Each structure stands twice: as C-alpha cells, then as structure tokens.
Amino acid sequence: MNTALKIILDKIRRYYRQYKMLTIRDGWKKAKWLKKHKIFHYIGENVYYTPNILPAEPFLVCLHNNVAISAGVRLITHSIAANVFNHEEDTNKYITDFGKIEIMDNVYIGANVCVNPGVTIGPNAIVAAGAVVTKDVPAGTVVGGVPAKVIGSYDNVKEKTLNKSKQYGGVTSGQLFVKDLLKIKPINFSIDEDGEKK
C-alpha cells in the first residue's frame, strides 16, 4: 500500500474514532467501545472515560483497573517542539518526542487535567481538576496545580467521601438521583431562582 493511501486511511480512522467519542455520551459505554476496538494499549475493568478527544497516539495509553477520567482531560502523547526547531533551522534533524501515559489502579482524574507524555500515575491517586501533570504521580497521593504537586493523600479523600456519604442516611451509590439526594440533604443558595435575595 502506498504512503498517500496509508495517510488517507489513517485520517478516516481518526475521524471515525473522534466521531464515536463525540456521539457516545456515557463514560462507561465510551470506555467499553475503546476497549472493544483496542484503541488504547490496554483498558482494564471498571474504567470510566468521558473526554471527547482521543490522544494523537492512543496506543501509547494504558489504563489499568478502576480508573475514572473526567470531561476535558487531555492525554498528550507527544511534543511537537521538534517541528518548531526544524522550521527555525530549516532542517529535519529534530525528531518528535513521544511518551507513554500509564494510569494505574484506582485513579480519579478531575475535569480539564492535562497529562504530559512519559507520565505514570501511581495506584490509589487523585489528580485535581485543572492540574497539569508533568511528572509521575506517587501512589496514594492527591496532586493538583500547575505543574501538579502533592496536596494530600488518597486515603484522606476516601475517608472524607465516606463521612459525607453517611450524611445521606445509608443510601448506597446508584440508588438515587441527585434531586433525590438533595431532598435528604438540601443545598441552599443566597438567592432564589429569580435572583431575589433570601
């Protein structure tokens, strides 16, 4: 097969995958589709994937078991700095740098996180929303910020979440919708729906 045809087929494949990411709205179903079609290097069990964008090289991404990835997360598998250097010097001696991203068991990644190439996120870790992960994340930690730094522990967040869950009186995950939970533990704003102060 000639190079031009390979490039065209690759573009069609990429556009089809992107279409699927936009049309499959449920994170569980999206992860199952990615796993079924072997888009990533590996996807374990109980993976929840909500981003609408796939990494440029999805085969460089490995998601272990019980991983939840929120909307807007970008998994960056390469740096295009080489393009800038090649154009600057009118050469082709600089090669694009690629790196794997491996996300271990029991990891939650918050909304709009950017994970850079070559990063491993250790087991039992949480990445706070908006973080930019430039280095490996140690096991059992919570990281946040730009660049991401350790700001807490996984076990502390787990304990706080359990304590908050107990406020709902023994209801278990998945039994009720948000509106049902708000009847048990109401949330009050300082203004009503019409903008009037309470």
Task: Show where each model-derived region lies.
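Soluble, non-transmembrane catalytic domains of enzymes that act on hydrophobic metabolites at membranes
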Residues: 42, 59-62, 198
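Conserved active-site beta-strand element of glycosyltransferases/polysaccharide synthases
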Residues: 143
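Beta-rich strand-turn-strand
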Residues: 111-127, 131-135
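Membrane-proximal basic amphipathic "stem/tether" segments
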Residues: 1-40
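Flexible, glycine/small-residue-enriched loop-and-beta-strand segment within the central core
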Residues: 30-34, 50-120, 146-147, 153-155
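C-terminal segments of enzyme domains that contribute to small-molecule binding surfaces
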Residues: 25, 94-109, 114, 148-198
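Hydrophobic, membrane-inserted alpha-helices
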Residues: 47-49, 127
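Structural motif
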Residues: 45, 65, 104-105, 120-124, ...
